[in-house]
């Protein structure tokens, strides 16, 4: 009976550990590289970087700066 409880407990511990690994790799923090919005935690993918509050206007401003206009 003791062997059965130990093996069940070990099995459950492995399941919990695997769930924690998946949850910690679920999303990227602000400032990390991304390709899609779902990769970012509480932010969106803005020009390849997770950013909070990225708008099309900010993207337009960066584009104008790259062409030397203000």
Curated annotation (Swiss-Prot):
Residues 1-26 form the signal peptide. It holds the Pfam family Conotoxin_I2. Its main location: secreted. InterPro entries: Conotoxin-I_CS, Conotoxin_I2. It is found in: Secreted. Disulfide bonds join 27-41, 34-46, 40-50, 45-54. Expressed by the venom duct. Belongs to the conotoxin I2 superfamily. The cysteine framework is XI (C-C-CC-CC-C-C). This is Conotoxin Lt11.6. It comes from Conus litteratus.
């Amino acid at each position: 009976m003791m062997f059965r409880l130990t093996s069940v407990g070990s099995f459950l511990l492995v399941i919990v550990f695997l769930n924690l690994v998946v949850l910690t790799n679920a999303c990227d923090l602000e400032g990390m590289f991304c390709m899609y919005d779902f990769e970012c935690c509480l932010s969106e993918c803005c020009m390849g970087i997770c950013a909070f509050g990225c708008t099309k206007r900010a993207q337009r401003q960066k584009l104008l700066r790259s062409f030397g206009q203000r």
